[in-house]
């Protein structure tokens, strides 16, 4: 277990009942996040709640019974505290989804201890989760997609120093951007690709989704051409030991990292769309948007993007869905005019 997990978990009243209770249905990283959230909450109580501050000197001293005596106001004050707090002189702010996650964690903790009858009152039942404001998805427009691939191909907007490297990487860069923009795969799935995962006969790649699930994703002939051009170069490169079979290689002949792909995308995006903050994930959003506009099938988009819940997809593409509904209003005629 990590030091953070241990210290925060022990802070939850020197027992790990809660973590033991949720272990069968949660990932270890989820439990670590829960532990951190609980630690932040207990620190808030100790530092900001006058009655607790005057009674206890450290978070591990706070008894479980304290949870029974909290009010909805205490939790609302915690939400305010989360938005902007001072931690040992370090200013920390939380975005809406981070605040919501911490409140969700508390709901789980209170619910668990109430269910096992360790507390007689569950104040969190009366606390509403903060509402998230949906942000407009940042993505490339259709002409910007073409411009980005063109820029990777010709490098016209690059500095002289960048152009020297570009000669060696342009075929790889075009292949990588074409794959991200033409399939919507995650950057982690992209860098995890091996030569053996690419099937040119069927225009498919075998990728490993979150949770270890293997899926075949299919690509267009346009993407195939870009991948084939890179593959012709790739087979002539001897990769470094420990990186055998990696499809996308760095200049050091090692498997590309997520960070290097992020930098690559940023480099070309700055040239073609300086006002948009484009990341590899935004290329995924671009693909999802274009696929949805072309097909109108939200279930297909969810499946191809690997969303386990179609509601996640609906939430992301709600604005386009609204446009489609608006366009439907004139589709059915009641009387010929």
Regions found by a protein language model. Give the residues of each.
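Conserved catalytic core of the tyrosine transesterase superfamily
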Residues: 7-337
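Short, exposed "boundary/linker" segments that immediately precede the start
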Residues: 1-2
